[in-house]
Amino acid sequence: ITDGINQDTIGLLPDLTVADIARRIPGVTSVSSTGVAGPRSQSASENIVIRGLAPDYNLSTFDGAPIATASESNRAANLSLFPPAIVGRVEAIKTISADMNPHGLSGQLNLVTTSAFDRDEPFGNLRVSVGENSTAGKVVDDQGENIRATGLYATSFGSQDQFGFVAAGSFEKFYATTRAVRPGGESGTYYFYTDDPASNETVDSFADSNGFAAPRRNQIYLFENEQERASAVAKLEWRPSAATYASLFGGWFYQDEQEVRHEHLAISNQGIRPENQTENTGDWTQGRIEAGYVYQPEETTTTAITGRLTHDFSEDNAIDLTASFSSAEVDIVRNMSKFLPAMSEDTTFSYDQSSGNPLLTFVNPDLSNDPSISSNSYIRERYQDIKQDLIYLDGAWMHNYEEDDRGFGYKLGGSFVNRSHSFDREYIEGDVFNTDGCTEADITNCPLVTFDQYVEDPTFSTTDPNVRFFLVDDAALRADWIAQGKPQTTDRTDNSINTDYEIDETIYAFYAQAAYQTDRLKVHAGLRYDKTEADVDLYIRDVRLPSDPDSAQFVPAKRSYEYDFLLPSIIASYEATDDVLLRAAYTRTIGRPNFEYIKRGEAYSAPDDTDPSDPRISISRGNPDLKPLVSDNFDISAEYYFDNGGSLISIAGFYKDVDDLIYIVTAEIPDFEYEGNLYTATVNQPVNATGASVYGVEFGLRKDFADLLPAPFDGFVFDANATWIGSEFTYINAEGDERDPGGWVNQPELMLNAQLSYEYGPFGAKIAYSWVDEYLSNILADSGDVYDVYAQPNGVIDMQARYELTDRITILGEVQNVTEEKLEFNRRFPTGDLLSGNTQRGRVVWLGVNFQY
C-alpha cells in the first residue's frame, strides 16, 4: 500500500524540501527536528512522521536503497538536503513486504529518481526564482533575497536509443529571522511548590503541589538564519532490450546553515518560592536577566552512488541486483558566550500569566537595563564531527514474478547493510578578564569583563515594556579572549571525550516471497530473516583514576550487540470491478534502537557512605542488549475511480501492535560490588518495556470537474485527504511509574490536506491548505506529571499562480505560509494551558520563471 506524488504535481506548489511534499500525502506530516526545547530555530521542518510514529523509526531511501545520514543520536534522515527538482516521485510506502528493509514501524519514504526513458524524446527544465521572507533582516544583519535555481536535463542516445542520461542540479539560499518566546520549553521552567506556604520544596506531581505554576525561566530568542543548499546528480542508464536495464546513479548534496541565536533570559531563584502567589500571579524574591549569544553553523555533506541491474533470462526468470555506497558528514560549531549579574532582590520580577503567556514586571527596570552590572559568565567553543558510511547490497532471483505475469511465482534474495557511524566532540570553556589596571601575574585573578563593554545595537522589546533585550557583541568578546590566549577556567576535557563513539553495524537478511497473480487478484506472501551484529567503541569513566584533567578518568571500552528476527508479510489486492480496488495486508516491521541508547558511556558516581548501613552508588550506562521495537501491522483499503480514472475516493484503515518500547528507567541493584565493597546501586539506563498500539483511518478524494462544469469552470480539480489517528500508550518514567500522556510523541489525532487547482488556457493556479491537530511534542521530565508539551493546531496556506508566455516559458508567482502562521507549544496543567514556546514563521513571496525543454 503506497501513496505518492509525481513530479508533475510537485512543481505546482512552493514546496522547498521533500518533507514539504511528503506532508501532503495521507497519513504523513512533517515536524521540526529540534523540538520546542532544542537549541536551534524551528523555521525548517526536516523530519516526517508517517501514521503517528516517530521519525527515528522511518527509513528514507533513494530508488529503494537506504542513504547514509549523520546524526548525533538517531537514525532519521535530514530530508531538507534533497531538493524536489531532482525527484521524479515521492512515495510513502505504508506496508513493508519481506523483500524490503524492515526498519519502518509505520512505513518508509522512497524518493524515485527521474529516468531518461520516462519520455520518448529529450526533456528538461530550468527554473529560477527570487523570494522575500517577511521576517528576514529584522535583527542585526541586513539579509538579502531568497534564491532558488534548479535544472534537469534527460536524453536518450545510441543507435537504438539504448542509453539514457539524466543530469540535475540545484542551488538555493534562504534567509529568515525568528523570534521565539520559550517560558516553558524545558523541564526546569514552570515550578510547583508544596501546599505548605512556609516550605520552599518543589514537587513534580501536581497532586502534591499548591496547584500554582510559577514561571521561573522566561526565555526570548532571536534567531538569524541563513541556509545555502546545493546538489548535483547524474544518472547513466542502459536498456539494450526490453529484457535488460542497468543504471548508475551518483548524487552530491550539500547544506550550509549559518545561524546566530541571541538570548534574553529572565530567571528567578527557584530555591525561594514566589510571594503573594495565586493561580496566575506571583512575585519572585530574587531574579536576574542573563544575556547570551550562540553562533551555531552546521555544514552537511552527503554523497551517494547506486548501481542497479535487472535482467530477464527468459520469459519467467529474472534477476534484480542493487549496490549502493553513501557517505554523510555533519560539522557543527557552537560558539557561546553569556553575561549575567548576581541573583538579587533588586533585579527580580513579578509575573502575570492570566493570558496563558507569562508577562513580567521588573521591580527596578533602570537597574535591569544596566549592562554594567553583568559580568562574563563563560565563553565557549564546541566542535562536533559526525560521520556515517553506508554500504548496501541486495540481490534477488525472480520466477514468474513480474507485474504482468500470471499464476504462481516467487522471489528469493538477500541483502547486506553495513553502517560505520562515528561522533567526535572538542569542547573548551573560559572567561574574558578586564586587564585594565590589573597587575596580577595570572590573568585569571583579574576581574571579569562586564557586559557594557560588549553590547551590540539595536535593542529589542521584552514582555516588560520598560525592559529591553540587549544583544551580546560576541565578535568583540571573542577577539579579546583570543588576544588573552583563550584562558580556560572550566575543565571541559570530559565533555570532549565522554560522548565520542564509533559504531560498526552490519545487517544480513535473506527473504523468500511467493506470488499468485490473476487479472484481478494479486497476493504476495513472504518471510524475511534479518540479523544485526554491531560493535561499539566508546569511553567510560573510571572514578578510581586521577581526575586532573577530567578526561583522565575515561578509558576506552567496547560493547557488542546482536539480534535477529523472522518477519512475515502477506499483501493482497483485488480489483472488484474495473473501478474498485481493494487491498489488505499483514506485515511485521521493526524500529532499530537509536544510537543514543547504545553509545551512552558508563559512569559511576563517587560512593555515598553517609549512611553506613546503606552505602550507595549511582551508575549511568547504555544498554547493548536493547531490542528493536517490533510492530505487527494490519492494513485494509478501498479505492473507487470514476470520471474515466480522473477522480478518486479512497479509504484506508490500519492497526499497529508495537512491542518493546524503549524508556530510560532507574532500577536498584542490592549488593552491587564495587572496589571490593558492597553497595546499593541505582542504575539509570534504557530498557525495553511496555507495548502500545496505534490505529487510524485515512480518507482521500480527488474530483476532476472537466465533465461536470461548463467552460471556463471545467478547469477545476479538487484534492483532499484526512487522517484520524488514535493510540493506546503508557509512558514509564525513570522511577518506573506509569501514566497515560494522551498519545505518542509527534502523533496528531487529525491531519487534513486540501488543494484546489485551476487550468484555463495558458493560466494555471493552485492553493493548498495543510492542517495538523494538536499533538504531544515532548515529555520533558523523568518523573512527575507536569512536564508534557503539546504542539498546538497549525494550519498553513500555500499558493501558486503561473502563466505560459510560450510553449516553453512560464512565469510563476508563489506564496508560502500566506497567513504567517506561527508554531506554538503549550504546557498542559489541570488548571489550563500555559505557553511552552512559540516561534514566528514568515511569509515568503516568490517570483520566478520556468523554461521547459
Q: Predicted regions: what is each one?
A:
Residues A19-P66, K94:
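Extracytoplasmic beta-strand/coil segments of soluble accessory domains associated
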Residues I21, L59, R89, I93, ...:
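Predominantly transmembrane beta-strands of Gram-negative outer membrane beta-barrel pores used
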Residues I48, A65-K94, G144, G151:
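Short acidic/polar hinge/loop motifs at secondary-structure boundaries
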Residues M100, A116-F123, G158-F163, A243, ...:
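Short loop/turn motifs that connect adjacent beta-strands in outer-membrane beta-barrel proteins
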Residues D142-Q270, E290, P297-R308, S314-N317, ...:
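Transmembrane beta-barrel wall of Gram-negative outer-membrane proteins
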Residues G287-T302, N495, T499-T506, Y561, ...:
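Outer-membrane beta-barrel signature, preferentially recognizing the C-terminal barrel domain
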Residues N434, A706, S770-L780, R802-Y853:
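C-terminal beta-signal and adjacent terminal beta-strands/loops
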Residues G653-I662, A667-I779, T819:
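Gram-negative outer-membrane beta-barrel transporters
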